[in-house]
A protein has these predicted regions:
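Intrinsically disordered, low-complexity segments enriched in small/polar residues
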Residues: 2-115
């Protein structure tokens, strides 16, 4: 009999997104509700080339305690979603920092650090 392996998910309070690409990006939060259905929050506003902005779930209507990931809406391009997921803990100072680079149709979203 195999015993299940449980991995502890990191709790975070927000994301930051740095735009290193030649396009306008908008940070959003993808989250799972109690039924396991995926939703997208509103966006945190335009992030222009060279800018870094917070993507704060508490300001985007994301329920505390849900499983979240960073979703980036790329204006006139291909959206991107982070491969990493976290548990949202409202008020936590822990931040997952990301950068997006490339072009509208060929971009890469990368995790820089969590802390």
């Amino acid at each position: 009999m195999c015993s299940p392996i449980y991995m502890a998910m990191t709790q975070i309070g927000k994301f930051t997104l740095h735009n290193g690409g030649g396009f306008v990006a908008r940070g959003e939060v993808a989250y799972l509700d109690d039924n396991g259905e995926k939703h997208l929050s509103g966006n945190a506003g335009d992030i222009l080339l060279g800018q870094t902005k917070d993507v704060d779930p508490s300001k985007l209507g994301v329920p505390d305690g849900t499983i979240i990931s960073l979703y980036v809406f790329v204006v006139w391009g291909t959206d991107n979603e982070a491969r990493q997921s976290y548990i949202y803990k409202q008020g936590s100072s822990v931040t997952a920092n990301y950068t997006i680079t490339g072009t509208t149709l060929s971009n890469t979203l990368g995790l820089i650090s969590v802390g």
